[in-house]
Amino acid sequence: NNSGAGILQGDTVIFAAVAAGDNITLTTTQGHDLVFGMALENISSAQYGPILVEGYTKLLRVNGVTDIAIGDLLGTYTVAGFAMKAAAGDMAFAIALEAYTTDDSLGVIDALLISPRLI
C-alpha cells in the first residue's frame, strides 16, 4: 500500500506509479486506466495485503449516484476506494451482481472482478 493512508476491505485499488512495480494506491479519477482490483482486507500504509484481481466478491464498495443494475460494468469513482457504474471511455474491472441505487458511497455489493477493459 503506497497510498499514505490505510486501504479498507472492499476498496478499489490501482497500480502505483513506482519503479518497484509492487505498490498499490487509491484514486479519485473516474475510470482510471491503472485499476488493478479490490482489497480483500484492511491494509495499513506501507504494508502488503491480499488483492482480488479476478473472481467473485461480496465486498466491493460502490457509489450509487449513477444507479447500478445487475450486469453493469464497474470502474473507479471520484471518491477514493469506491467503484461506480462505468461510462463510455472508462476502464471497467468488475460486473455488478447486485443492484445499488442509493445516492451515496455506502454500498457494498456482490460483483465479479474481470480483466480490466476499456468501454
Question: What residues fall within each predicted segment?
Answer:
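Extracellular receptor-binding modules and their adjoining Ser/Thr/Gly/Asp/Asn-rich linkers
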Residues: N1-I119
